[in-house]
Amino acid sequence: MQSQTDVWRSRVSSSLGIVLGAAVAAAAVAWTGTAEAQTKTLKMQSTWPASLTLQDNFKFFGERVEKLTGGTLKIETMAAGQIVPPFEILDATSKKVIDGGHGISYYWVGKNKAATLFSNSPAGIVGMDQMDFLGWIYEAGGLEMWWDFYQKDLKLNVVAFPILPSSPQALGWFRKPIQSVEDFKGMKCRQTGIVGEIYKKMGMNTVNMPGGEIVPSAERGVIDCAEWVGGVEDLRLGLPQVWKYHYTPGMHENASIGELIINKEVWDGLTPQQQEAIRSATTETLVRWWVKWQKQNADAIEEMQTKHGTQILRTPPEILTEFLKAWDEIAKEEMAVNPIFKRIYESQKAYASKVVPAKRFMFPPYSFAANYYFPPQSR
């Protein structure tokens, strides 16, 4: 029996340049003569407010599935709260209250902290970027470990696929300038999952909440600072309306990937062609959003500065270094008591130990040519 990664490899090239062509080809050949086929509709819900591009990512996926299947499979892409609260979509999918969901696995760290290793992966686990992390998923058994984590470790009736690139992310939004970790002390900040624990080690008081609650909480004085995503997502959520100082980058989500989850019985009930369409659509959506965000984020930064007077500042290196140290401590502590976390972390570290040093040697620093053609200006 083929592994999930082997199945994926047989359909989608590891070259991102070929992925889009493969998806287009699938649309042309995967479904023929389907006019008479019965249409199936899957009801899925995200964890995102309807106004965000995160939800647009979900809708784009649904549109691609419908086209790739010639209209025989449709996805109803509902926003957060339309059926269940945002943080309940995993259990709702497993219990078949909904057929699937669109979110990010670090929301499920309450079930097991290893959930963070399939999504935001603080510090890229050990220095990986988003491409490296996807390499682990597609080429080093990560997808199988993801499915096993949900099905065997958490006893949930779901399958999962990477679909949403959401990094690198900004450090966050603040009411006043910050210079060092000392400035975190006494601040109450919106952070999620294991990242919240890391910032607690650094002196913050942290609270978890869905994105839609951030602005109202800030306006009521419940929180002093917040992290969401950065760029266009923060702009759409309205964060420049309540905070003036925006620091970037962060080190907490520099290899972050959102997920599509589907009830396993629903997945098994799809035809091979419908499953293929979902695989192709998730991969195409991932790549298209990766490149789309580049321009959207650049435009958003400009709008924050010109229309909202946002002070966009580089994060002091000391803060990033202290984050890495705190993350290493928490990862070590968790591995000592959580064999599931240890198994996944060590797999990622083994992959990174080969890829990250080689990539550092082969790739020129992004700033090398960027600074030559576009000399940096102080913000």
Which residues fall in each region the model found?
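N-terminal secretory/targeting leader peptides
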Residues: 21-22, 38-133, 149-379
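Bacterial N-terminal signal peptides that target proteins for export
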Residues: 2-21
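Hydrophobic core
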Residues: 20, 24-29
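General helical secondary-structure elements
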Residues: 5-7, 36-39
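Core domains of carbohydrate- and sulfate-ester-processing enzymes
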Residues: 140-145
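A short, highly charged nucleic-acid-interacting micro-segment common to nuclease
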Residues: 136
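Sec/Tat signal peptide C-region and signal peptidase I cleavage site
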Residues: 29-37
